[in-house]
Amino acid sequence: DDGWFGDKYRRVQDNSSLGDWVVDRKKLPNGLENLIQTADRNGIKFGIWIEPEAVNSKSELFEKHPDWALQVKGRPLQYGRGGTQMLLDVCNPEVQDFMFGIVDNLLGKHPQIAYIKWDANVELKNYGSTYLPQDKQSHIYIEYHRGLNKVLERIRAKYPDVLIQACGGGGGRASYGVLPYFDEFWVSDNTDALQRIYMQWGTSYFYPSNAMAQHISASPNHQTGRIIPIKFRCDVAMSGRLGMELQPSKMTKEEYQQTAQAIKDYKSVRDVIQLGNL
């Protein structure tokens, strides 16, 4: 998850290190390989969190390439999450190569990685590009997504079998424009099962269930504080692509039993839920 990376600037808070996609050896002295091997020994496929489109002003990447961040000439930079986060200028082919390299380096060194959570936690705040000519500055949204699609096309051409989730502050990446490249999108950061019923029902009017990531989460819920029985949480999450957002060390015996049964039941009907015709 978020926090595995950073060298000169370690990712100990959310205000640094985005762009510096190297393993934090103080946190992980044996690197990612040890984690991957541990997961494999326990019969679990390994997944990793990245946010390739973003950069922190407190990062080695920004120190080396300040022109790689979206920016308006003559205006101060506007920051998002952590007071330091910005979007990279994906219009720029050099930035596109860098972003592809993030994924290519990870999967090249660690071919056992089966899942990527591609996050996006800052909106476009600086409406300018140092790469685009003056007459294209008004096309920043269009050129940004054209550049992003070029990166994603390269990733999918080389790594067609890796499962990639489009996450973005909740449903920020729920879009048919990204579904050719992503296997699923995160419906919402709000995982309260009662509220999720309404969200998932509404989303299902526009998107198929096999594109909707729906996870069993903790109780009390982290977003609403609501206490919800584990059976109800499982049942609601089973209406799309079932996943887990639970810390095993904090799970009760009942939660272990119910989630194990839910996963077993889900596998028996997964083809119908994800691919069935109504």
Predicted regions located by residue number:
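Glycine-rich, phosphate-binding/catalytic loops in enzymes
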Residues: 14, 51, 133-134, 183
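Hydrophobic faces of well-ordered beta-strands that scaffold small-molecule active sites
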Residues: 46-50, 116-118, 165-166, 244
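Active-site-proximal structural scaffolding
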Residues: 14, 21, 28, 32, ...
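Polysaccharide-binding and catalytic clefts of secreted carbohydrate-active enzymes
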Residues: 3-4, 8-10, 18, 82-158, ...
